[in-house]
């Protein structure tokens, strides 16, 4: 009996969402459109420079965004991440549980809850400055293996591979998933993340993963090629199921080496790409745990992603639960 659709593991970060201009990014010297790890002092300097700008708080982190969107679609899940007994940590727990995701990891009595300043420019691109804080101290002892074993999927974010203790937690989750018959889904997270740990990601994809999520840039980084088609073929040769997003071009689905394209849904009012990949993964995981074919799961993933880019921040303001057949037609295979 599977009690949860997905057991998610990732960095627990409070997102601080701030709209800004390209000129500010250029002035500060940040690479647009990617995630950069920074210390508290640097992050504080950015917040000071943007004092007076509108700011919004959300519980976040890549895998957390996926879990929240999964619950919005009607899925069930439990999330593992590390926060501190501080204001941000308490906000994080309450916000996750309000969104419908179980979050029961005991908070640390030391350090500070991690934060991610998300700078959104008028073209809807997001640039993330992340101070991991206590989230980087997540260990294998924080995993509730009993909950993992009664989940259909474990879902692990690639960003966790940047720390020794979080890496150890990832490996244990994957190993225990395989033992318990729980399918392993892994997201590559970021092309820079892939480049930092390419050999490890290759090994994980080949030996542990039942399903990988990536975008075209991440796929090219793993395959060491400039061709997204060749990259997808390569990853498909080492993992049974691959979901590769390609921006407004929708997604490519590979099952046992057979590749198909699933068109995207038009976004009428593109505001912010924060969480688009995370929400795509949520839609796919919802579909796969509710009887959808891989192609129809990707269709639902594309729809959820098309809705999130019309919002500021990685949180849907519309409830999608129970609307799958209305939106997709007969979505079940």
Predicted segments with their positions:
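Hydrophobic beta-strand scaffold residues
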Residues: 77, 103, 184-185, 242
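Conserved phosphate-binding/catalytic loop of the ribokinase/pfkB sugar-kinase fold
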Residues: 104-108, 118-164
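Alpha-helix C-terminal capping segments
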Residues: 67-76, 118-121, 287-290
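Conserved beta-alpha-beta core of the PfkB/ribokinase-like small-molecule kinase fold
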Residues: 153-233, 249-251
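Glycine-rich phosphate/adenosyl-contacting loop at the front of the ribokinase-like
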Residues: 1-80, 91
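A glycine-rich helix N-cap at a beta->alpha junction
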Residues: 95-112
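Conserved phosphate-binding/catalytic region of the ribokinase-like
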Residues: 1-13, 19, 26-37, 176-179, ...
């Amino acid at each position: 009996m599977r009690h949860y659709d997905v057991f998610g593991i990732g960095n627990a970060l409070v997102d601080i969402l701030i709209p800004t201009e390209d000129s500010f990014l250029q002035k500060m010297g940040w690479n647009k459109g990617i995630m950069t790890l920074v210390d508290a002092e640097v992050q504080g300097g950015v917040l000071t420079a943007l004092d007076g700008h509108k700011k919004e708080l959300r519980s976040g982190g890549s895998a957390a965004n996926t879990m929240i969107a999964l619950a919005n679609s009607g899925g069930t899940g439990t999330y593992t991440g590390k926060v501190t007994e501080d204001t941000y940590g308490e906000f994080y727990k309450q916000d996750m549980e309000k969104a419908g995701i179980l979050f029961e990891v005991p908070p640390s009595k030391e350090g500070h809850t991690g934060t991610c300043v998300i700078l959104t420019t008028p073209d809807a691109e997001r640039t993330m400055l992340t101070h991991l804080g206590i989230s980087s101290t997540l260990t294998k002892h924080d995993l509730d293996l009993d909950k993992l074993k009664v989940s259909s999927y474990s879902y692990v974010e690639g960003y966790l591979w940047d720390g020794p203790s979080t890496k150890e937690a990832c490996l244990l989750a994957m190993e225990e998933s395989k033992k318990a018959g729980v399918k392993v889904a892994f997201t590559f997270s970021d092309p820079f993340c892939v480049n930092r740990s390419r050999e490890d990601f290759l090994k994980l994809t080949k030996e542990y993963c039942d399903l990988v999520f990536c975008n075209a840039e991440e796929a090219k980084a793993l395959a060491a090629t400039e061709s997204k088609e060749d990259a997808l073929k390569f990853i498909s040769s080492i993992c049974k199921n691959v979901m590769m997003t390609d921006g407004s071009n929708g997604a490519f689905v590979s099952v046992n080496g057979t590749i198909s394209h699933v068109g995207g849904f038009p976004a009428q009012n593109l505001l912010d790409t924060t969480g688009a990949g995370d929400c795509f993964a949520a839609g796919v995981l919802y579909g796969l745990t509710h009887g959808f074919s891989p192609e129809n799961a990707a269709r639902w993933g594309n729809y959820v992603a098309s809705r999130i880019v019309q919002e500021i921040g990685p949180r849907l303001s519309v409830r999608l639960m129970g609307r799958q057949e209305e939106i997709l037609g007969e979505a079940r295979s």
